[in-house]
Curated annotation (Swiss-Prot):
Its cofactor is Cu(2+). This is Plastocyanin. SUPFAM superfamilies: Cupredoxins. CDD domains: Plastocyanin. Gene3D superfamilies: Cupredoxins - blue copper proteins. It comes from Rumex obtusifolius (Bitter dock).
Length: 99
């Protein structure tokens, strides 16, 4: 599944903001608009036993250009919340459910 970082209208959002994948399915986050974005999983909102730092980008690491991607594969079932650290305050947050 491919998730856009930034709406086609320039919105600071993940598109779609909430989605479901199968365990082991690759998720590709793709910069859509050229604003600097990243993907950080919230350590308090991932399934028990999952190390959020191992599936997140570094807070300082950014996808700056349109078309740049970050891929992650989640194997533990459950719900994961994530955000873009530069734009979290603007509501750029998302959620993925792994089945």
């Amino acid at each position: 599944i491919e998730i856009k970082l930034g709406g086609d209208d320039g919105a600071l959002a993940f598109v779609p903001g909430s989605f479901t994948v199968a365990a082991g399915e690759k998720i590709v986050f793709k910069n859509n608009a050229g604003f600097p974005h990243n993907i950080v999983f919230d350590e308090d909102e991932v399934p028990a036993g999952v190390d959020a730092s191992k599936i997140s980008m570094s807070e300082e690491d950014l996808l700056n250009a349109p078309g740049e991607t970050y891929a992650v594969t989640l194997s533990e079932k459950g719900t994961y919340s994530f955000y873009c650290s530069p734009h979290q305050g603007a509501g750029m947050v998302g959620k993925v459910t792994v089945q």
